[in-house]
Amino acid sequence: MKTAYFIKRTLLVCSVMMYSLHALAIKNPVDYVNPLIGTDSKYELSTGNTYPTIALPWGMNFWTPQTGKMGDGWTYTYKADKIRGFKQTHQPSPWMNDYGQFTIMPVADKLVFDEDKRASWYSHKAEVVKPYFYKVYLADHDITAEMAPTERAAMFRFTYPETKESYLVLDAFDRGSYVKIIPEENKIIGYSTRNTGGVPENFKNYFVLQFDKPFTFVSTASSGDIHPNKTEESGKHAGAIVGFSTRRGEVVHVKVASSFISYEQAELNLNELTGKSFDDVVANGRNVWNRELAKLEVNDDNIDNLRTFYSNLYRTLLFPRSFYEIDKDGKVMHYSPYNGEVLPGYMFTDTGFWDTFRCLFPFLNLMYPSMNQKMQEGLVNAYKESGFLPEWASPGHRDCMIGQNSASVVADAYVKGIRGYDIEALWEAVKHGANAHLKGSASGRVGYEYYNKLGYVPNNVGIRSNAARTLEYAFNDWSIYTLGKKLGKPESEIAVYKERAMNYRNIYNPERKLMVGKSDKGVFNPNFKGTDWSRDFCEGNSWHWSFCVFHDPQGLMNLMGGQDEFNVMMDSVFVIPSKMGMDSRGMIHEMREMQVMNMGQYAHGNQPIQHMVYLYNYSAQPWKAQYWVREIMNKLYNAAPDAYCGDEDNGQTSAWYVFSALGFYTVCPGTDQYVLGTPLFKSVKLHLENGKTVTIEAANNSFENRYIKTMKVNGKNYTRNYLTHDQLMKGIKIQYQMDAVPNKMRGINEADAPYSFSE
């Protein structure tokens, strides 16, 4: 009996070991991605404000099922009952909305165009959602719809019922559109001009649809009216309907491509599908996603964490969007969203630097530097074509958010060693943006005249977010100074930016120990409350913004009275009740998101405070950073439709998770340092583009064991609270011993603290 028991026990242990090994072997990371994360959102409360993006990494065109009405920024919401079509979209956020969009929708047994009448019930149980493939059953039409993308094209596979009235509806949307049906070629061409700003007057998205089945019926539509046998339509709201007789289970393929340049270029872009079956396109998309995701090789047996990690990595690799095309001679060209001309070179768009300078672009510099090299080329072109670097591009300059954070994006890329573009043009661009403003946009600096003269933007001169702008401009000046120093520019040219980098001190109120709005006479706001979401700040309050001194935490610490006072102030963020400040202005979704998360005044759903917990590394309490980073990852992220605690914001909030799961974060882009948090996984390998590998191992890591007991780098004990870019680029092995009890003797010496400008 004992022998039998021993054999059974041994077999059980071996089975568990085999299961664990199987769980650790992640061969296809794309299988862990859920594109539905963040889609359970609404105007009042964001859990991401995303849509299921069916696309390739950084693709020019995205595709998504459309549940919202035409023009609704919430194009797909998880709880919606009906699908209205499958939309080519370029939307970065519901707040920015879309441009150049159009929708196609298969219908059966009824001739309809209206979006409400053509809409069909569907179920998530009959929906398959992958980054490279989407499939759904349209119950009202008895049609199965499938789509698979390339960078600028997509292929659809529609399985129709038995009927003589199978149709495909093309809706080119309102605000100016055109369609032409070419029956002899089984083709539809047209364009959409719909946009919400940021485009030249000649903006068009030209499209072409190629069918593999002849049409038995053709019709156009104009503002909802159907015109049978008509093949061409232009006007405010044009559309097309083509029909065919189908057997049950008959498949119709539709190839779709578009171009911002011309019809001819759209036809060239359609060549991305030449010689490929639908399954080929699916397989290619799967391979592309696996290739990019596998550069971060995670080994762990917590499947929930794996799903959350790779789903966030997927979101990190979507924006900025490619906005360039390849001409007939194989040359890179782009339609300029700034001057309307067709010009050579790269262009990227649909990113707001206010969000993404923080860690999205630093992440690209670490893991995908060749892609960011192209993006820097795109910034050179944007400057040459408009006279300014964009701060929020969609597709051209938009008037949204604050700061001149393009300076950080440029500086961080160059400091991290990215080369091969016109850095001198970008140097001139960041200097120009620091001393000018492009009217009607966020580009340059609003209030630069006051800032340059007084050292801050006053709160009584009609400029909103004045205190927040002051803090950002000080950091932006530091970024310019750092770039200039790296370029070897003379002190006479860069000294002014060095001096202005300390301007954050000008709005610090020692009585409040917080940043406070200030008049042009030097008087602090007498009605100030730290929890008020006032007009002196941007989408937050002083508790969120007072720690936004990325480049000089030590200087901020000195203002607050030293390490102890600094730590008390940070601790207070999590203690002050989240309901405080909710009556300070009309409710906005960022306020509600902070309130309901029950983490005090910590508002991870918005960007200004996302770095704050890492600041404990500067104040000799790194174990608190370890505690709070893991708490945020565990509590505020998952791989479900309610994945986020606020807007995902074009990769920024996702990149925060990806970086934090690796165990470090870029508190101050423009330095070469990554500030430590706590690793989430047992083992990670980063396969760098230069062929080197970063290996991160965390022994005894678990839900409870979130604290770093010991740390070794290349076999040697390591007490610093940061790693350098150079260390990582050379290839490195990082070994942690994790524990449930904080080690309060590690990383507490002055030499262990990360970079501060005023040291």
Question: Model regions: which residues?
Answer:
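Accessory carbohydrate-recognition regions in carbohydrate-active enzymes
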Residues: 26-361, 365-408, 414-471, 479, ...
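Extracellular attachment/recognition segments
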Residues: 707
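Bacterial N-terminal signal peptides that target proteins for export
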Residues: 2-11
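ATP-dependent phospho-/nucleotidyl transfer catalytic cores
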Residues: 476
